Curated annotation (Swiss-Prot):
This is tRNA pseudouridine synthase A. Disulfide bonds: none annotated. Homodimer. Keywords: Isomerase, tRNA processing. It comes from the Bacteria.
Length: 267
């Protein structure tokens, strides 16, 4: 039986989602829990592999089990032993050919920034602090230049090893908040550090160090040295996973192209 689990977690005290040799990760927490339940190793397969310090409001993984536990009991059984910085929101059965990564058709990230004269210790690890005044309207117009299908070689980590760095963004916008702004971006998939590099670039736009007209040139250059900064992980949230292409079409229109993850990596 294949089971799909929806979870949320605060990333401050994790080295990321994926198993690490010597460190606390989200995958490690769940595989330890499942091993205790099954008396054997059980591998989980996530929709996304978030980095160190990145949070998730909605994340999924699947695993296979032979245990005869009522579906209504899985959530309780997991949450009663998980640490406080992880929570299981839902557990359902899925078809045996379902794959959490390959059946993912889109993801939405939100990057949270607060602006103030002084750093707020109660925001530490949850939002990124920027004291400078920024031109949010200009940043939003620059952000919208990324909507569509582009080669994001110049806007991802140089450690990115995937062959194709072409991704499609359906949404890219700056939204003003009471204490700063959020950057919201939805796409077919994302390269290593891509969202954080986009945020860092947009902040430079807001400071007047880049122009809106620079976006097409930087995309065309495919040179990360032209966009050298990366925003901190602490403000980044994996907000939504699209497993249903009809939901994605409803949100962004029937004319968008659906991308399957069998050809996309590093997400």
């Amino acid at each position: 039986m294949r089971i799909l689990v929806e979870i949320a977690y605060q990333g401050n005290n994790f080295l990321g989602f994926q198993i690490q040799q010597n460190g606390r990760t989200v995958q490690q927490q769940f595989e330890k829990l499942l091993q205790r339940m099954h008396k054997r190793h059980v591998r989980i397969h996530p929709s996304s592999r978030t980095d160190r310090g990145v949070h998730a409001i909605q994340q999924y993984f699947h695993f296979d089990t032979e245990l005869n536990i009522p579906m209504s009991q899985w959530q309780y059984a997991m949450n009663r032993t998980l640490p406080d910085d992880i929570y299981v929101n839902n557990v359902v059965t899925v078809d045996d050919d379902f794959h959490c990564r390959y059946d993912c058709v889109g993801k939405r990230y939100r990057y949270k920034v607060y602006q103030a004269q002084h750093r707020d210790p109660f925001q530490s690890g949850l939002k990124t602090f920027i004291p400078e005044t920024l031109d949010l309207d200009k940043m939003n117009r620059a952000a919208q230049q990324f909507i569509g299908t582009h080669d994001f070689t110049g806007f991802c980590s140089q450690k990115t090893e995937v062959e194709s760095k072409v991704r499609t963004l359906y949404q890219s916008e700056i939204v003003k908040t009471d204490d700063g702004f959020d950057y919201i971006v939805t796409g077919s998939g994302f390269l290593y550090n891509m969202v954080r590099v986009l945020v860092a670039f947009l902040i430079e736009v807001g400071k007047g160090r880049h122009e809106i007209s620079d976006v097409p040139k930087l995309l065309e250059s495919k040179n990360r040295k032209n966009v050298p900064f990366t925003a901190p992980a602490e403000g980044l949230y994996l907000e939504k996973i699209y497993l249903d292409e009809n939901e994605l079409l409803k949100d962004f229109g029937n004319d968008i192209k659906i991308h399957r993850k069998k050809s996309l990596q590093n997400d």
